[in-house]
A protein has these predicted regions:
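SAM-dependent nucleic-acid methyltransferase catalytic core
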Residues: 92-204, 209-212
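Conserved proline-anchored active-site loop of SAM-dependent methyltransferases
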Residues: 8-27, 31-38, 44, 114, ...
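Class I S-adenosyl-L-methionine
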Residues: 287, 294-351
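Conserved Class I SAM-dependent methyltransferase catalytic core
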Residues: 101, 236-296
Length: 361
């Protein structure tokens, strides 16, 4: 609210799960998200260009007899052992059928939205999830799961995939979808498909230095989307070299500078990381680079990350990111808008609600 106005184009070049562009669309801005990781792109696209509830439920009803017919046609010996360990044969056959039917869709937005819904139920701890009980935030190591299933004689659940998919859709639509549609891309952040000076505000969090687990942490979701996590890992930027990281950040900042309008701001969320036994403040490393590119460094904000809020919560302080560092940059002169926000009662300003009856969990 302080850095953009209604109608502005708000860009996140590393959109991850799409939170920033979604919030932009929910608040009468045009959210644009980009991420080279396929799973991140699918989730971003689903949030800012969602299908309608009617189309989703209509497709599920259409798919029911087709899933029943196709489920028996799959030879599960063709499926990787690492995948099979998570699912009963009954459930896995349905997953394969649903995936194939989604791939055959010509409607890109509906197809993508259904993929995102499936990613949301592919694994997790509750009865809506299709796998054995596991974590939802990341795909667990198949080696660990194999040992756990064997040692504890775990029974793989039989799920009705389309029923779980429908329940997931009802929960997603319960709070409404953004009235403003955004745009999603899956390209290198150093070469965005945007015109010069076309963006009003940039907010993003580049890949943290020395954190290289994204593809592996989503290996099972990537499998569903038809990707190998090893192939995705090769495409994503990753390095243990601080010099290469600086070169990457410089190229990204150049691209942000190119697409950002004059007298506008860019907020870059970085972190403090441990390197060779010492704490490195990435803001101190990146700020001079931003100035070299042409930005003004308006301010640096420090914010501790509670362990419970970390994406990679299983890392200790020596491995992960202990503190977020927010770098506020301006291209030309920019003063944040004087807007007071009641965060306790704040609500989206542009939202569409479709009446549905949400089934109990």
């Amino acid at each position: 609210m302080k850095y953009s106005r209604p109608g502005d184009k708000v860009l996140d070049p590393f959109s991850g799960k799409g939170t920033a562009p979604l919030e932009a669309c929910l608040n009468n801005r045009v959210g644009l998200g980009n991420d080279l990781a396929p799973e991140a792109y699918v989730l971003t696209m689903a949030k800012i260009r969602p299908a309608s509830y009617r189309d989703v439920i209509g497709w599920i009803e259409w798919a029911k007899p087709r899933v029943v017919r196709r489920a028996h046609d799959y030879d599960l010996d063709d499926v990787d052992d690492d995948v099979r360990i998570f699912y009963s044969s009954y459930t896995l056959r349905q997953i394969l059928a649903v995936r194939e039917l989604i791939q055959e869709l010509e409607d890109g937005e509906l197809s993508n939205f259904l993929k995102a819904l499936m990613l949301g139920i592919l694994h997790g701890p509750s009865s809506i999830h299709l796998s054995i009980k596991s974590y939802h935030s990341f795909s667990m190591s198949p080696g660990y799961v194999k040992r756990y299933v064997k040692e504890n004689n775990i029974k793989k659940p039989k799920r009705e995939v389309l029923k779980c998919l429908k329940l997931k859709a009802e929960r997603v639509f319960r709070d409404g979808i953004p009235a403003v549609k955004g745009y999603a891309f899956m390209v290198d952040a150093r070469s965005l498909p945007l015109e010069d000076e076309s963006i009003d505000f940039v907010i993003t969090s580049p890949p943290y230095f020395n954190m290289q687990t994204y593809a592996w942490d989503n290996w099972l979701r990537l499998w569903f989307l038809g990707y190998s996590y090893k192939h995705v890992r090769e495409k994503l930027f990753q390095t243990n070299s601080i010099m290469k990281f600086k070169e990457f950040i410089k190229d990204c900042l150049k691209e942000i500078f190119r697409v950002l309008k004059w007298d506008r701001a860019a907020v870059i969320v970085l972190g403090t990381v441990k390197l060779n036994g010492r704490i490195v403040d990435m803001a101190e490393e990146v700020a001079p680079i931003a100035e070299e590119v042409g930005f003004n460094v308006q301010s640096i904000i420090y914010d501790g990350i509670p362990k419970s809020s970390k994406y990679l919560w299983y890392l200790d302080g020596g491995q992960g990111v202990n503190k977020e560092v927010i770098l506020v940059l301006t291209k030309g002169e920019f003063t944040p808008y004087n807007v007071w926000i009641d965060w306790m009662n704040a609500k989206p300003t542009s939202i569409i609600r479709e009446y549905i009856e949400v089934l109990p969990a």
